[in-house]
Amino acid sequence: MSKQRIQLSDHFTYSRLLRFVLPCIGTMLFTSIYGIVDGLCVSNFVGKTAFAAVNLIMPLPMLLGTIGFMLGTGGSAIVGITLGEGDQKKADCYFTLFLLAALVSVSVLAVLGIVFLRPIAVLLGAKGELLDYAMRYGRILMVSLPTFALQNMFQSFFVTAEKPHLGFWFTVGAGCTNMVLDVLMVGIWGWGVEGAAIATFISQLVGGVLPVFYFIDRSNSSRLHLCKTSFYSKVLRDACINGSSELMTNLSMSLVNILYNYQLLRFAGENGVAAYGVIMYAAFLFVAVFVGYAVGSAPIVSYHYGARNHAELNNLYSKSLRLIGVIAVVMTALSMLVIPYVARIFVGYDAELLALTSHAFRVYALNFFLMGFNVYGSSFFTALGDGVTSALISFLRTLLFQLLALIFLPMVLGIEGVWLAVTAAEAGALCVTVLMFITKDKVFHYRKVPC
């Protein structure tokens, strides 16, 4: 029984729910790990200038590729609801439409990105050797942008298709490809930043193109198949609105990172910026657990909402909040234990920087206790098709509250205010999330089953 295939229509116990979301959590963790390896290879084999250039230009393809996240989360919710309503053919048509829409729109953005790459890099502060590295790395990533968007989309749709394990193994394949090619192209063959970019491109072909062949095959055993489709303008618009929280999150991250770096340069100079970089790399691993759970459980919520199974919605809602609470405590405690070791791996060569990073990470890590509830809340409302509420939580959490905290807390607390800003933002966002959970129940009936 324990090995029986789990379906979206099932009743979910704690065990069944965890088994269903674990592949998605693993996918997010593995993606974070091979991203870290990518950065370490450039830093150690090419140098700090190349590493700085990669980090400088990386937000641009991340921003342009956000359409994949947006249509992946927003589209999978619509497809999941449609499956719950029992319309398999329409679900396949919507699935195909979302993939084609992402492919076309991101391809256009990739061309524009290549054309305007140099002026954007200069605007971000690149010049001289830094600009040269940024251009060489950025051009290749712009070419790979469509595959990057598809890879992001499939992370959500594999779960909706009841194939989270297959999605995990595609990610493992892409990650291993990236790491092996990084070592070969950057470390052994000496191809520099171009080698790192090519390794990323090839890995995205594994994660973004190979799944297309799987879903084209009509004999595959998943819930979804690619097929001939039509242009459903309203459905596409709804998917964009529904997934707008993902767009907001990625846009906000870039703006917030700029302000973080500005404040840290004021209070701690280059060491402050370096410490923040280490914290971001390490935080990816902890955030991945919360995001993995939220993304992995969202299609279940969409399906049962589409099926009007409010009893199961209540079951999923209550169990998820309890699990998030346990995970939050474990993640916060674990981060406190591993902080010295993680900091030493990145900056063990500098005692002053090591001490600053270790202290800053301990203060920053307090936000892990709150973050999970906000991440889940935003994803939960996306799964219910309420993109406006989801986007509101994301906007307040990742942009407005963080910007306000980063501006005002350092005025009172100095650099400690910078490290505490994210926790203050999560606390403010949690108040909004709880309020939305209470008020929106009148519409979606996930806390109380209607008579």
Segments from the language model and where they lie:
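Transmembrane alpha-helix boundary and packing residues in multipass membrane permease domains
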Residues: C24, M28, L40, N44, ...
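Transmembrane helical elements of multi-pass membrane transporters/channels
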Residues: R19-D38, I140, A174, S203-G207, ...
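Short runs within selected transmembrane alpha-helices of multi-pass transporters and secretion channels
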Residues: G72, I140-V159, G167-N178, A196-P211, ...
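N-terminal transmembrane alpha-helices
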Residues: L8-V46, P59-G74, I78, L103-A110, ...
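Interfacial/gating helices of multi-pass transporter permease domains
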Residues: V42-M62, E129-Y133, V193-E194, V235-N242, ...
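Small-residue-rich hydrophobic transmembrane alpha-helices
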Residues: F51-V111, F148-G167, A275-I339, M371-I393
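Short alpha-helical transmembrane segments in multi-pass integral membrane proteins
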Residues: M1-V21, V79-P146, I188-G243, V301-N367, ...
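Helix-terminus/linker motif at the lipid-water interface of multi-pass membrane proteins
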Residues: I33-A52, A121-G128, L184-W191, L251-Y281, ...
